[in-house]
């Protein structure tokens, strides 16, 4: 069985408190984005952990990959290559892998998401996909982008 799920949490709008209760309309407009984001992230993390625990209890050899599509983007600020803190915050993806009986080597530790499935297939299904170069792009407009991986990845 293969299941792919894109969970839209903790994306904006930030509507959940850390215990899963909905915030009030007043709180929605009063809370700072960072505070609201962290509360919703805590709630999301607890739900993801519940799912992972159920998968581990039900299946003896599950393959589990949990990833974010990007890091925290405060107010959806424009990201520029001269703002290191904004770049680091925005592109700090979360990646967690559970492959039964397999430990990834340092060369296989993904720095970006581009190789996630290549690593999964190579380690679990006998493939030999070459790992791609890590790249991170910011877009100045629809037709112009800049690779900033050299700035964020040592």
Regions found by a protein language model. Name each.
Residues 1-154:
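Catalytic domains that recognize anionic headgroups
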